[in-house]
Amino acid sequence: MKNAAVQKLSQTLEDDLPEVVRYVKNHNLGFFIPYNLNGDEKRYIPDFIACIDDGHGPDDLLNLILEVTGERKKDKAAKVSTARTLWIPAVNNEGSFGRWAFLEISDPWDAGNTIRAFLKDPDKVPEFVLK
């Protein structure tokens, strides 16, 4: 299921969202977000990073980390929480790596609508994305 979901999200980013300037499947890139699970240091490797023109212009693209939500594993909550509440605020506060955001995609077949809703109002992430 996860492979089909990842392929569908990739297709959506490629074909259906003109605001996506570029994207990459985060595979063997070395990009990870460190997190802690029960006292153990771990590495969270998100599925995609998309550079999106969200109205701030081509010189100020939004780096949107996208995670396709599959089955709920015990570490999923720790990964998502760390990315959303620690890593994103820290990298944005530091400022030299551009603007960053994080979004979980629970339904890759509706990813276009989910991403557009997020871009329209990032503070009102649909409830199904937050679970």
Question: Residues of each region from the PLM?
Answer:
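Electrostatic, structured charged patches in enzyme active sites and in nucleic-acid/phosphate-binding
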Residues: M1-K131
